[in-house]
Amino acid sequence: MLRIITCICLCFLGGSIAQAQRLLPKQKGISFSWIAPAEAFTSSFSDDFGVQLGYSINAKRGNYKHFALEYQRRLYPYKSLNIPVERYIGAGGYSFALISDSSKTVALNLGVEALLGYEVVNHSKSLLPDGALLTNENNFLYGAQIGLQVETYLSDHFLVLCSGKVAALWGSSFELLRPCATVGLRYMF
């Protein structure tokens, strides 16, 4: 009788789906994201973009520390010209898990980051081709960023990231608040 019960239990255990544990503390990940500023959605085509390379370290309860390097480029129209503004930013912060399903396949997080960077206006050239003089200068930037991020596991190691963020950057002669959307991929190891 014991042999029959053991065989039945083994059949039920073998038929269940085995899933890897996710969001383990001290698990690390590398991510690559594409950044689209909010202004990119108002026109039919925009050359404004950004990229981000990130590194994350999981903490407890689905929270994690996040560090990233970003490059952002935005074109400001002036007569028939486009004046490029490039931003090189380092970010570091913490992401808090707000809600997730029981298998941790889909999660919604709130992230807060400190930002530090440098802004280059028109490739450091203040004189425009028509003779006009730019009053905007290259500057160091500092600020903070807050955003909501949806993370979805494609497999036990790959995640798709979608987020909406708003950054407040001081030190720039351009706008203070900069909303953006990001889409990316993270590899957990």
What is each PLM-predicted segment?
Residues 1-27:
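Cleavable N-terminal export/targeting peptides
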Residues 19-69, 73-74, 186:
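Short glycine/proline- and aromatic-enriched beta-strand/turn motifs that initiate or cap beta-hairpins
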Residues 22-30, 61-67, 104-110, 138-140, ...:
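Outer-envelope beta-barrel architecture signal
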Residues 33-38, 75-77, 129-134, 165-168:
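Extracytoplasmic loops and strand-loop junctions of Gram-negative outer membrane beta-barrel proteins
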Residues 54-129, 158, 187:
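Gram-negative (and chloroplast) outer-membrane scaffold detector with strong preference
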Residues 134, 141-152:
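Acidic, glycine-rich flexible loop segments
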Residues 177-189:
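Outer-membrane beta-barrel "beta-signal"
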